[in-house]
């Protein structure tokens, strides 16, 4: 419970910094496929060293912040309903890619997912031994997940592929 309290307070205090970082990313990277891939890779990397739930909580915080910006723009008539709906769909796409990234990265190391701690404890493995022994399974899964992200965005499968208007 104490970990949860620290996690929530850290995210709350870092919200503005995270919003600035992600705003710069959205302004700099124009390709939705590249942006989606960046979110998957970033979430996977962070989840390899932090609990996947913590990384997901950070993604949710940033997504809610952007949603509030879209909502404020819509209510003040700066954007129309269609742009607002596209913005929501864009955020949902990015959020889902980030969530998949946390799962992909979380399975690679001992700290990423809680069940990995149990597996490593029962097998007597340390951090790097867990990584090396699980790599024949986890690395192909990670690569497959990255390829799926690109293909889903490229071919707009399952209503993915929404772009933000300028």
Predicted regions and their residues:
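Membrane-embedded alpha-helical segments and adjacent helix-loop junctions characteristic
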Residues: 1-81
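Long, highly hydrophobic alpha-helical transmembrane signal-anchor segments
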Residues: 19, 23-31, 111-125
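Juxtamembrane and boundary regions of transmembrane helices in multi-pass small-molecule transporters
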Residues: 20, 72-98, 107-111, 128-166
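Transmembrane alpha-helix interface/packing and boundary motifs in multi-pass membrane proteins
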Residues: 42-52, 99-111
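Re-entrant/interfacial helical elements at transmembrane boundaries that shape
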Residues: 54-68, 108-123
